[in-house]
């Protein structure tokens, strides 16, 4: 089964130890600022040479997920792509599958950092345009990718990308289907919105 990177939560101890003023200042400088982008709709784009890197947790992925990631890296690494100015762009990968057991449509993608800063703690919402037309009589809902941390993204530099698998839950899934279905990702158009991240200074 492909490892879907959607339900990812971070936890921490709120009772942080006290540090001196110098250390506190250093911490703020490293944290950077929090950025929120409502949508990419209507924003200018430009063509950019991008570099796509394997995610840091590659050693812990199963072979199937690793293969999907490697295919998308091969597809997009060192290529010129149209990306949204000063935002996050999603490029659709080659893997697409309807999983009747989990009642979801999964597809691979590459997240591109189109900003001028290194970033971390990235989260966003995704939706499929005309999701009711992907598979007849099925509707797939929006979903949220929660805080991809630096441990998951690595050094997420400008004009670089990392692979991901997105999952869209089926509305009113019955579990009646017994067989999965491969999806032609060329027919998918995915929108990204409510983007949030922190810059790394």
For every predicted segment, state its role.
Residues 1-4:
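Sec-dependent N-terminal signal peptides
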Residues 11-106, 162, 168-201:
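Membrane engagement elements in two modes
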Residues 112, 116-158:
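The feature marks short-to-medium sequence segments in extracytoplasmic or secretory-pathway proteins
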């Amino acid at each position: 089964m492909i490892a879907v990177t959607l339900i990812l939560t971070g936890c921490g101890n709120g009772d942080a130890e006290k540090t001196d003023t110098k250390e506190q200042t250093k911490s703020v400088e490293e944290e950077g600022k929090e950025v929120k982008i409502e949508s990419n709709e209507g924003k200018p784009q430009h063509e950019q040479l991008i570099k796509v890197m394997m995610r840091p947790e590659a050693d812990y992925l199963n072979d199937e997920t690793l293969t999907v990631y490697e295919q998308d890296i091969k597809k997009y690494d060192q290529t010129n792509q149209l990306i949204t100015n000063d935002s996050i762009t999603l490029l659709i990968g080659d893997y697409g599958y309807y999983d009747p057991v989990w009642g979801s449509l999964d597809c691979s993608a590459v997240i591109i950092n189109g900003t001028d800063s290194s970033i971390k703690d990235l989260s966003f919402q995704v939706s499929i345009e005309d999701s009711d037309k992907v598979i007849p009589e099925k509707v797939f809902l929006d979903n949220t990718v929660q805080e991809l941390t630096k441990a998951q993204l690595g050094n997420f530099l400008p004009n670089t990308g990392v692979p991901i698998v997105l999952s869209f839950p089926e509305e009113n899934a019955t579990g009646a289907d017994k067989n999965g279905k491969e999806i032609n990702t060329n027919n998918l158009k995915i929108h990204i919105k409510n983007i949030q991240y922190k810059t790394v200074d």
